[in-house]
Regions:
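C-terminal subdomain of alpha/beta-hydrolase-fold enzymes, centered on the catalytic histidine
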Residues: 1-127
Length: 127
């Protein structure tokens, strides 16, 4: 019974569901942003999701993440799928931030990165 129950529970597991993001057609560009020591979405949660999807960590690396390849930025069509190339990656920021309502300098960098990504499908970072 427990094996059967586990298969039902697995469908709701975010780490398992996250892997499907790049298995569906068409694959869409994907930017994931992580604020080091975030207390809203814990880094461990973000990292499990990113590992499950198979995304790289884009430079600059603020904290190494086990199981993620480090790639240079900017990123454009940097990952391959059976349907072709797409842009995706994880970027890190030095502090917890909010780009809603102004936020910190890091928040402004994160917002600029997100806007640029949405406009160009290119992931840019700055050191």
């Amino acid at each position: 019974f427990s094996a059967l129950a586990q298969t039902v529970v697995d469908e709701g597991d975010p780490a398992i569901a996250a892997a499907r993001v790049v298995q569906r057609s068409p694959v869409r560009p994907l930017l994931v942003q992580e604020a080091i020591h975030d207390t809203t979405v814990y880094n461990q949660t973000t990292e499990v999701m990113v590992r499950s999807i198979g995304l790289p960590l884009l430079e600059p690396e603020l904290e190494a993440i086990n199981g993620l390849e480090l790639e240079p930025a900017p990123a454009v069509e940097n990952l391959a799928t059976p349907d072709g190339m797409f842009t995706a990656g994880l970027t890190q920021f030095n502090e917890e931030h909010s780009f809603f309502g102004g936020g910190s300098a890091e928040g402004q960098r994160a917002l600029h990165q997100a806007i640029t990504f949405l406009q160009t499908e290119r992931i840019e970072t700055s050191e």
